[in-house]
Amino acid sequence: MPIEIPTDLTPELVPLSWLIGEWEGSGRLGAGEEDSEHFSQHVSFTHNGLPYLQYRAESWLTDDEGTRLRPLTVETGFWALERKQREEDGGPGLIPADIVPVLKSADEVEALRNSDGGFDISVSISHPGGISELYYGQIKGPQIQLSTDMVMRGSHSKEYTAATRIFGLVDGKLLWRWDVATGAGSTQGGGLEAHASAILSKIS
């Protein structure tokens, strides 16, 4: 599947452009074993001309034939190349960005390429229940690897200490896996465990 880059996309988002659009598909909770529960998911990556992608994923528990049983969760966030913020960048809050993008050309974006041949990225994701994650990682072509740098929990949130996520574009489909650590209650002394995985097809 050819990747179409929107004409109004800021150069800084070109490495992430293959994510843009809406995706739907299904997956399994846990390690995807025979008794693992099924879910369906709708994911969107959108842009508004600024140097980040807006992310939203809504999931539903399903039966093994894909019929929705009940809502599972929603998560939202922002994806961007990881770089030092400059005076021309917007924020914090409503402080406007300069009308001219900080990175104005492909050559300026290329200068951010790391020693592994990819680009460092940061991803922030918020969940119901007072939990927010800050991930750092790398995008290298159609592959993404993320690890939490910080997990923020509210005073009454469930235990949740770390996570990793991987994404890949394979034959036009978006594949992802999410591993989490939930503290001492997890097996193997609180280490990362398989949480969920899915295969999504692009619908727009």
Curated annotation (Swiss-Prot):
Question: Which top EC class is named for this enzyme in its record?
Answer: isomerase
The EC number(s) this enzyme carries? 5.99.-.-
- Which coenzyme or cofactor does it need? heme b
Q: How is the cofactor bound?
A: Binds 1 heme b group per subunit, that coordinates a highly solvent-exposed Fe(III) atom.
- Give the family from UniProt: Belongs to the nitrobindin family.
HAMAP family according to UniProt: nitrobindin
The name this protein carries in UniProt is Peroxynitrite isomerase
Annotated organism of origin: Arthrobacter sp. (strain FB24)
